[in-house]
């Protein structure tokens, strides 16, 4: 059996003191605790650490830039795989080329230890980033396909209803192969890019 860990970086209130020092201190403590636990998990043989991307989730999820966290983790761990669980994909959050670049950068830094999971986000996040909720599924699927295309082609271009991307060399490139595999829960569709023969996912009902 292979065991994974999932982190949102909870920073529960109350945060004693005055803003902004109280928030900064609480977040620093939560990140430090997470890093300590993940480094121990690496030594104990856990398989993957998954970090979720969320925005504005006060107290519950303060991990808005998992690529930055994974970049740091890549330098203080040796074997544990680094999972984006999930990376928000509808057009409006992050341009697909930037997603391809940041995920591949972590893959290079970690010597091929990246797992890439994707999602559509929550209505609260979509509203703040100007994402059309009704189109979010179609936009996410288009963005995912374009990212994989950028990894699989030396000079990639993409033209669709949502994106016009000219021919460019997107770099760095992922060190791992990409073969899309789709997982669905009753509430949200999750797409994971499989980089190995083994891959599993458990979603809440």
Task: Pin down the residues of each PLM region.
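A structural signal for isolated positions on well-ordered beta-strands in alpha/beta enzyme cores
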Residues: 4, 48-50, 83, 115, ...
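Active-site oxyanion-binding pockets that recognize sulfate/phosphate
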Residues: 23-24, 31, 89, 130-133
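N-terminal beta1-alpha1-beta2 module of alpha/beta enzyme domains
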Residues: 1-76, 80-81
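Internal, glycine-rich beta/alpha segment that forms the wall or movable "lid"
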Residues: 9, 92-205
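Conserved strand-turn element in the central/C-terminal portion of the radical SAM core barrel
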Residues: 83-91
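Short, surface-exposed connector motifs at secondary-structure boundaries
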Residues: 50-53, 79-82, 175-178, 197-199
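Short His-Asn-centered micro-motif
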Residues: 59, 85, 184-187
């Amino acid at each position: 059996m292979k065991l994974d860990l999932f982190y949102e970086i909870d920073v529960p209130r109350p945060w004693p003191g005055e803003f902004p020092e109280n928030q900064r201190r609480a977040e620093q403590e939560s990140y430090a605790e997470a890093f300590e636990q993940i480094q121990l998990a690496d030594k104990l043989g856990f398989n993957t650490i998954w970090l979720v991307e969320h925005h504005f989730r006060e107290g519950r999820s303060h991990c808005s830039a998992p690529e930055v966290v994974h970049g740091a983790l890549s330098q203080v761990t040796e074997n544990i795989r680094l999972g984006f669980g999930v990376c928000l994909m509808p057009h409006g959050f992050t341009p697909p080329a930037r997603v391809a670049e940041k995920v591949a950068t972590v893959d290079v830094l970690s010597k091929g230890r990246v797992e890439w999971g994707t999602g559509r986000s929550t209505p609260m996040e979509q509203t703040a980033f100007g994402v059309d909720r009704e189109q979010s599924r179609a936009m996410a699927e288009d963005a995912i396909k374009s990212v994989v295309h950028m990894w699989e082609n030396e000079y990639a271009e993409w033209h669709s209803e949502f994106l016009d991307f000219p021919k460019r060399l997107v770099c760095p490139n992922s060190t791992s192969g990409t073969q899309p595999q789709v997982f669905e829960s009753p509430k949200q569709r999750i797409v994971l890019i499989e980089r190995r023969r083994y891959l599993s996912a458990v979603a809440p009902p």
